[in-house]
UniProtKB/Swiss-Prot annotation:
This is tRNA dimethylallyltransferase. It catalyses: adenosine(37) in tRNA + dimethylallyl diphosphate = N(6)-dimethylallyladenosine(37) in tRNA + diphosphate. PANTHER family: TRNA DIMETHYLALLYLTRANSFERASE. InterPro entries: Dimethylallyltransferase (IPR039657), IPT (IPR018022), P-loop_NTPase (IPR027417). The record marks 101, 123 as: Interaction with substrate tRNA. It comes from Methylobacterium nodulans (strain LMG 21967 / CNCM I-2342 / ORS 2060).
């Protein structure tokens, strides 16, 4: 199996996990997560992580292994994914990388800029200085310090603006100075079968809405209640997962349950649209776009 992998991408609720599990069972594979929210242990239900029964049916890696208090970066993911890929090949298992986070796939295939880590004290200081300020104002600061880097970041993208300011504060150098040098990705030179699941739009919207209701029935609100009790920084990725802000607003009395559900459904539908758009413009022509039904017929005959 060394030097081979299957990559399965697609929007949320497109059936990626079911296809990955079926392939892992049929081909002796190991399922490797490529979803930036499913890494967090706090949100099994709300991020639609594989169930314990599914995880027992085939090996699964990089699911729920990160605490919600951690700001888990693409660099962290790349290091973890490189390790589990090597372990899979050493065990003669086929890696099946599945998820909807485009930057994870891009980093696996193309590598990542060699940006040094930012000390936590520096990160905290930058965020404390930024608290209460508009993102556009922070972006203007960045434009003065790093015009080239600021030009690559939307003025409203607070997380990326803060990240660039943190790097400047930690290293004394602009983010753009590091973006020319790349460390190769662990899938560089690997024979990869690349699949993108693309359901029809109406069907996907219906699945997203129905799945959110199922999540509520399965305990999503209790999950968010436990997360809220931790009093984490609202800027952390886990606190911005689809459904979390609306359900916290409901727990705080600002939204009804029905309003929180509607917000979670709408946020997830918008995210799915962005996922499709990103992949359409960012990945190469060697990715095969299939409907979930086409993929099942081709790769899981008899299922």
């Amino acid at each position: 199996m060394a030097g081979r992998a299957i990559l399965i991408a697609g929007p949320t609720a497109s059936g990626k996990s079911a296809l990955a599990l079926g392939l892992a069972q049929a081909r002796g594979g190991v399922v490797i997560n490529a979803d930036s929210m499913q890494v967090y242990g706090d949100l099994r239900v709300l991020t639609a992580r594989p169930s314990p029964e599914e995880e027992e049916a085939a090996p699964h890696r990089l699911y729920g292994h990160v605490d919600g208090a951690v700001n888990y970066s693409v660099g962290h993911y790349l290091a973890d994914a490189g390790r589990v890929l090597r372990d899979a090949w050493a065990a003669e298992r086929l890696p099946i990388v599945v998820g909807g986070t485009g930057l994870y796939f891009k980093a696996l295939l193309e590598g990542l800029s060699a940006i040094p880590p930012v000390p936590e004290a520096v990160r905290a200081a930058v965020r404390a200085q930024a608290e209460g300020r508009e993102t556009a104002s922070l972006h203007a600061d960045l434009a003065r310090l790093d015009p080239e880097g600021a030009a690559r970041i939307a003025p409203g993208d607070r997380l990326r603006v803060l990240r660039a300011l943190e790097i400047r504060a930690a290293t004394g150098r602009p983010l753009s100075a590091f973006q020319g040098s790349r460390q190769p990705g662990p899938l560089a030179g690997v024979a990869c079968e690349k699949l993108f699941l693309a359901p029809d739009r109406a069907g996907l919207r219906a699945r997203i809405d129905a799945r959110f209701l199922s999540m509520m029935e399965a305990g999503a609100l209790d999950e968010v209640r436990r997360l809220r009790a931790r009093h984490l920084d609202p800027m952390l990725p886990v606190m911005r997962a689809h459904g979390v802000p609306g359900l916290i607003a409901h727990l705080n009395g600002a939204l009804t349950r029905e309003e929180a559900v509607a917000r979670g459904q709408a946020d997830t539908r918008r995210y799915a649209k962005r996922q499709v758009t990103w992949f359409r413009h960012q990945v190469g022509e060697d990715w095969r776009w299939l409907t979930p039904e086409e993929a099942a017929r081709e790769f899981l005959p008899g299922h």
